Amino acid sequence: MYILGIESSCDDTCAAVVKDGRELVSNCVASSAAEQNLYGGVVPEIASRRHIEHISQVARAALDEAGTALDEIGGVAVTFAPGLIGAVLVGLNFAKGLALSAQKPLIPVHHLRGHIAALYLTHPELEPPFLCLVASGGHSHIVRVQDYTHFEVLGRTVDDAAGEAFDKVARTLGLGYPGGPAVSRAAQTGDPKAYPLPTPHVEGPYNVSFSGLKTAVLNLVNKAQMKGERVNVADMAASFQFRITDILAEKLLLAAQDTGAKQICIAGGVAANGLLRETLAAGAKKLGARLYLPELQLCGDNAAMVAAQGFYEYRAGNTADLNLNGLATLGIDYL
């Protein structure tokens, strides 16, 4: 069964075709990141306007690349939550129009469920149950994936998401947007022990907090400026990256140890971070667990993940009518 996926929850306009939830057939993305970089981050109004301009061409490109006609598609899967509401609505309304005109099922997909489903495209052998750290610009969750459509949140951020912290620290250091890749590049020549940044303590064994870590970087930069000095950007980037990836890895590995999970995964934009991947690989080996990592091209926002999860939502009977509304916030464990 072929599923057409549509994703527009942030600044990337995406469409893809996936077969049977596991086989990536096409994957097309039009990004406005370069334009957003001029403003130091995502401007929702600009993101929505670019989605309107690009979405029909991107969807057509995905079908053409797949060599598939719209009438051969089994359903139209679309991100309906969470995300920038204006951006979400562009993709949702486009998907409604496609589903109506082609008389195909409309399949609502939660954005974070989609990130997890990207793992099925990289690892067709992976099946629930497993533990997954989902870390992106807007979310940081440790999730027990019980089956393809049932999720239990074990831990979450109590303030800033990991990707958000990367973006804000990158802006503080003058590294540009998106912050994750920018910080990682700067950190390559830095000393991760140069600045001893704090490890915030929060209630809940698997919860995380990054607001204090972000503020610690800002304070060090401001203090240096007040003295007429400058922090070493490479060292600060390396120190921040070391601390935040250490926190994320520690929490996921603790959850795996406590639950006895033998399959652990990461997903979302932060899953592309090389140091996080290395740290988790070493930790998983010590636990005797297998670590599953998504392909780098499937870490950030894309529609392939939406189409993959859409297949399982459809199989579970989770379709919607044209009254489906977009939501800015919604837990991954919604019923």
Describe the role of every protein-language-model region.
Residues 115, 294-334:
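Glycine-rich phosphate-binding/hydrolytic loop that grips phosphoryl groups
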Residues 124, 146-191, 214-215, 219-223, ...:
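Glycine-rich phosphate-binding loop plus the immediately following alpha-helix
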Residues 78-104, 274-283:
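Short Gly/Thr/Asp-enriched flexible loops that form oxyanion-binding sites at enzyme active sites
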Residues 2-82, 111, 115, 236:
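N-terminal beta-alpha supersecondary unit
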Residues 109-131:
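Conserved phosphate-binding catalytic cores of ATP/NTP-utilizing and phosphoryl-transfer enzymes
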Residues 13-18, 132-134, 140-144:
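Short beta-strand scaffold segments in enzyme catalytic cores
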Residues 108-109, 281-306:
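Conserved phosphate-binding/catalytic loops in two-lobed NTP-binding clefts
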Residues 185-264, 274-287, 314, 334-335:
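A contiguous, well-structured pocket-lining segment that forms one wall/lid of small-molecule binding clefts
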